[in-house]
Amino acid sequence: MKNKFAALVITLFVLVLAIDNVTTECLEGCECNQDSTGKTCRPKQGSNVSPAVCLAQYCYHGYC
């Protein structure tokens, strides 16, 4: 029974993280990469934000 409960908790945690990532607007200095099917973020033109920082974020379709 403990294993089933632990699996449920882990599954819910991963689901919450997935939902949070999908609905996150890109950080300041980043913009949504419309060419990417994963809707990742990229640095805005002239921004000094690292590409790695932007790529760590996902953007919701409405922000693209």
Curated annotation (Swiss-Prot):
Signal peptide limits: 1-24
Highest taxon, organism lineage: Eukaryota
Tissue localization of expression: Expressed by the venom gland.
Organism of provenance: Scolopendra mutilans (Chinese red-headed centipede)
A GO molecular function held by the record: toxin activity
Post-translational modification: Contains 3 disulfide bonds.
Subcellular location(s) per record: Secreted
Keywords assigned by UniProt, alphabetized: Disulfide bond, Neurotoxin, Secreted, Signal, Toxin
Name of the featured protein: Putative neurotoxin 6
UniProt family annotation: Belongs to the scolopendra neurotoxin 6 family.
Any one GO CC term of the record: extracellular region
